[in-house]
């Protein structure tokens, strides 16, 4: 079996020699170029499994080489080597299609990790990625989404996944991880809005025994738990400002220090994040740091809401009903034609999650394994009317009407946060005490 090959592009002989020796010890063959012209000539003569290029070259920019390789040799991952502190340059490289980046002086441990990760990438021309049956839909937006997931899986760039609640952002993050070179390492999801602010630093970075009351033993943080894999920051907009500063530093330095610890520990983690909020608007309102926003939003991936892919609803409904039948051991129910039309005309503010909840209820209520329009109870759902408000003639009692709206909104927040009451209260802009009072008043357990 022939050895894998790496192309090294740098005009400094000392750097070239260091990279050649390190990669040679990893059992890689290397070819070296001093500039863009020589690199192109080598690429035209033979294939490479990896390219390491300096940002500044005598006859051009490393960015030009990244773009050239992306167009002519997309199967070859490229890592950019930049000067220390040149984060803007590194982000430019990632946006251009670079797999990852290193800063000078080159950390050899980090270099070896990067090379090992790059070599685990699947060649897109050698095999086609299997279609994952968890991300259903044949509509143009879903086909485009699956294509983007495949491309982003080959990169180590941070990805900001935007989309409405219930649209499947965590599933998309999980697929990016599973289709990439980190698949054998952990995927660690965390709901940023569900962690109490006083415990946040300990949760993310870990703590040492005795560092605070209740710290009876050393604890590993989320960054270390995700080492070598992916850390998914869900509802990242809910992070308090003080934590945003610490998160930014951890991402930039690729190192964390436990609460009560004296030394930083290097971490190799890919960062994916998501929120149902408009993160750019949060920056404009002063609730989210602009520097962290630019660090997280190297590439944005939008997950379409269900109303933008209505043609996928019958397929989704069929799969959900089959799963419900399998879970209960009962025959699968079928949507009538009228019920399908009702679903396709409904706005689904809660997206796929709302569809799942709606069909689970209808499956329980239907007769003869036939789901009729009335089983869906769309008239009671939040998206049944675009105006969302009843006329005066429909309201018998204002207090009962307002209480019903309050109950629906609280239930929706609880479902979207998987019944985490603290997170649901934050989403509704309530204190936990106020949330607890309303739950008791409305009889919600």
Swiss-Prot record:
- Explain what the UniProt record notes about the effect of disrupting the gene for this protein: Deletion mutant results in changes in swimming, swarming and/or twitching motility associated with virulence in specific hosts.
Q: Where in this chain does the record put each Response regulatory domain?
A: 5-119
Say if the entry is tagged with keyword Membrane: no
List the stretches of this chain annotated as a DNA-binding region: 418-437
Annotated binding of ATP, by residue: 163-170, 226-235
Give the Gene Ontology MF terms in alphabetical order. ATP binding; ATP hydrolysis activity; cis-regulatory region sequence-specific DNA binding; DNA-binding transcription activator activity
Q: Which SUPFAM superfamilies match?
A: CheY-like, Homeodomain-like, P-loop containing nucleoside triphosphate hydrolases
The protein's location, in the record's own words, is: Cytoplasm
Top-rank lineage group of the source organism: Bacteria
Q: Which GO terms describe its cellular component?
A: cytoplasm; protein-DNA complex
Q: Which CDD domains match?
A: AAA, REC_PilR
- One of the GO biological process terms: phosphorelay signal transduction system
Question: 4-aspartylphosphate-modified residues are where?
Answer: 11, 54
Question: A Pfam family for this UniProt protein?
Answer: HTH_8
For this UniProt record, the keywords arranged alphabetically read as follows: Activator, ATP-binding, Cytoplasm, DNA-binding, Nucleotide-binding, Phosphoprotein, Transcription, Transcription regulation, Two-component regulatory system
The chain positions of domain Sigma-54 factor interaction read 135-364
Instruction: Write out the PTM section of this UniProt entry.
Output: Phosphorylated by PilS.
Q: Which PANTHER family match?
A: RESPONSE REGULATOR PROTEIN PILR (PTHR32071:SF100), TRANSCRIPTIONAL REGULATORY PROTEIN (PTHR32071)
Q: What does this protein do?
A: Member of the two-component regulatory system PilS/PilR that regulates the expression of multiple genes including the type IV pilus (T4P) major subunit PilA. Thereby, plays a major role in the regulation of multiple motility pathways. Upon appropriate environmental signals, the histidine kinase PilS transfers the phosphoryl group onto PilR. In turn, PilR functions as a transcriptional activator by direct binding to a cis-acting sequence upstream of the pilin gene promoter leading to its activation.
Its recorded name reads: Response regulator protein PilR
Origin organism of this chain? Pseudomonas aeruginosa (strain ATCC 15692 / DSM 22644 / CIP 104116 / JCM 14847 / LMG 12228 / 1C / PRS 101 / PAO1)
């Amino acid at each position: 079996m022939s050895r894998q090959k790496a192309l090294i592009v740098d005009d400094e002989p000392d750097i070239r020699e260091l990279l050649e020796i390190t990669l040679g010890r990893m059992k890689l063959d290397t070819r070296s170029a001093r500039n863009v012209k020589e690199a192109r000539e080598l690429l035209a003569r033979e294939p490479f499994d990896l390219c390491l290029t300096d940002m500044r070259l005598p006859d051009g920019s490393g960015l030009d080489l990244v773009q050239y390789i992306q167009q002519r040799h997309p199967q070859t991952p490229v890592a950019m080597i930049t000067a220390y502190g040149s984060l803007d340059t590194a982000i430019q490289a990632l946006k251009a299609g670079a797999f990852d980046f290193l800063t000078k002086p080159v950390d050899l441990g980090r270099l070896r990790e990067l090379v090992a990760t790059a070599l685990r990438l699947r060649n897109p021309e050698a095999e086609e990625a299997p279609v994952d049956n968890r991300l259903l839909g044949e509509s143009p937006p879903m086909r485009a989404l699956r294509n983007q997931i495949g491309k982003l899986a080959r990169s180590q760039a941070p990805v900001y996944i935007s989309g409405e609640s219930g649209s499947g952002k965590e599933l998309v993050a999980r697929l990016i991880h599973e289709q990439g070179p980190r698949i054998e390492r952990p995927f660690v999801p965390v709901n940023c809005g569900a962690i109490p602010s006083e415990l946040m630093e300990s949760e993310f970075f870990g703590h040492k025994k005795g560092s605070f009351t209740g710290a009876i033993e050393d604890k590993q943080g989320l960054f270390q738990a995700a080492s070598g894999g992916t850390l998914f920051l869900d509802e990242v907009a809910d992070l308090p400002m003080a934590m945003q500063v610490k998160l930014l530093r951890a991402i930039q330095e690729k190192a964390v220090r436990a609460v009560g610890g004296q030394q930083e520990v290097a971490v190799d983690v890919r960062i994916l994040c998501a929120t149902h909020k408009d993160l750019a608007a949060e920056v404009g309102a002063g609730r989210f740091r602009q520097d962290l926003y630019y660090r997280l939003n190297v590439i944005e991936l939008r997950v379409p809401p269900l109303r933008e892919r209505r043609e996928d609803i019958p397929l989704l409904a069929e799969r959900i009903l089959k799963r419900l039948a399998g879970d209960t051991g009962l025959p699968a129910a079928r949507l009538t034609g009228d019920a399908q039309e009702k679903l396709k005309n409904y706005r689904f503010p809660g997206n796929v999650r709302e569809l799942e909840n709606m069909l689970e209820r209808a499956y329980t209520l239907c007769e003869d394994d036939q789901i009729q329009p009335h089983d869906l109870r769309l008239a009671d759902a939040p998206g049944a009317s675009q105006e969302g408000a009843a006329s005066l003639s429909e309201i018998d009692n204002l207090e009962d009407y307002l209480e019903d709206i309050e109950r629906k909104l609280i239930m929706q927040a609880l479902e979207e946060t998987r019944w985490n009451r603290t997170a649901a209260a934050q989403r509704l802009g309530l204190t936990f005490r106020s949330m607890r009072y309303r739950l008791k008043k409305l009889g919600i357990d």
